[in-house]
Amino acid sequence: MFYNYYSTTTIFAPQAVIDALKTDLKNRVTPIANDETKSWDGYELTAIPMYNLREEAKQFHTKGRGNGYVIEKDDMRVYFSGDTEDIPEMRNLKDIDKAFVCMNLPYTMTVERAADGVIAFAPKQVYPYHFRGQDGLSDTDKFKSLVDAADIDTEVIMLDWYPNNAE
């Protein structure tokens, strides 16, 4: 017998996402805005702003529309950047155990800016993700080299997010 996760799953999303959902799902989602924190089942979810800084990219992600997230449980803090650039809110994060940081042009940030941001908040581990852009894959080996060369204690973990990629 299968458990019905649909009826018990807690879903949080920014209002822009909720507005795009079909009514049956829309009514099940709790809105969460930038800088808000929600708690459920021993978890704490904090919405971190995500947005573009470069003038040519501001059309993709405006400040206040979307979220990255810090999820915390039992003293473990995990950050998901969402589609963002090297913004002050990311640089100012503290005590992050695992970070998932994007880098794909033109929608998010360059490899160099992603590395600079990670170096600023120095998570224990960082996973480059969401790095396939319009012109192929971002150079995650370069990202790893830049972070490894910094004087911080951050382990870069490379996962095969695109196993069927032809590149």
Language-model segment annotations:
Residues 1-13, 95-100:
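Active-site metal-binding motif and surrounding structural segment of the metallo-beta-lactamase
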Residues 25-37, 41, 115, 119, ...:
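Binuclear metal-ion centers of metallo-dependent hydrolases, dominated by the metallo-beta-lactamase
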Residues 70-121, 129-137:
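Metallo-beta-lactamase
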Residues 45, 83, 99, 126, ...:
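Divalent metal-coordination and catalytic microenvironments
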Residues 13-20, 33-35:
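Short, polar loop motifs at secondary-structure junctions
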Residues 7-16, 125-130:
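Short internal beta-strands
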Residues 3, 19-25, 39-40, 91-94:
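Short loop/helix-cap segments at secondary-structure boundaries that form the rim of catalytic
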Residues 32-94, 161-167:
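Core dinuclear metal-dependent hydrolase active-site scaffold
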